[in-house]
Amino acid sequence: MSPAGRPKGEFRWAKPEGTPVTVNPPPLIGPEQVALIARRVSVIVASRDSAHRPHLMRAVGRRVSADLRRVTVFMSASSSAAVLADLRANGLIAVVFSEPSTNRTLQLKGRDAMVAPIEPGDEAVVQTYLLHFIDEIGELGFNESVARTMLCATPGDLLAVHFTPEAAFDQTPGPKAGQALSPVAG
């Protein structure tokens, strides 16, 4: 939230007759990026503490809001303590979605990360993500136990991290790596 109590990224001004008008910028991600996020990707969440020391941990699932403005990643509370502490303290987050079989990679950054309990249906999202990731790395020769070890999280240990992407980058190896993505035209 902004100091004025409005969600970050929301702009207000007064029309001549004094009626407030709210304008939301277009979402930073569009159907192409959502399609990549929905694929069998590896999801890595990064944060930093007040001394600028980085922390990172693998997420165990992900979801994009219907309006494409918010991204949620699911994390194991017990194995992600440092990242979650950073996010609670400063809200700064970077998330990388990378498809192991193709190296297609998207990085999203935000400043408003919020740690929250999971919601009804989130456990199913996490389970589906695990099964898809097992298939993805299975095609690369890794057996199921590798994925289950990497993505180990029990329902009582899951937390959701919600954030608004404020910057997006194509991180797929090649000539466009590091290129910033523009907001999606509405």
Label each residue range with its predicted role.
Residues 38-76, 106-107:
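Short beta-strand segments
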Residues 2-27:
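Short, compositionally biased leader-like segments
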Residues 11-13, 104-186:
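Charged, gly/pro-rich active-site loop segments
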Residues 47, 75, 97-99, 164-167:
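Short, structured patches in soluble enzyme cores that scaffold and shape functional sites
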Residues 18-42:
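Short, basic/aromatic recognition patches
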Residues 32-34, 84, 148-153:
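A generic local secondary-structure boundary/capping motif
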Residues 61-103:
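A short mixed-secondary-structure module that forms the rim of ligand-binding clefts
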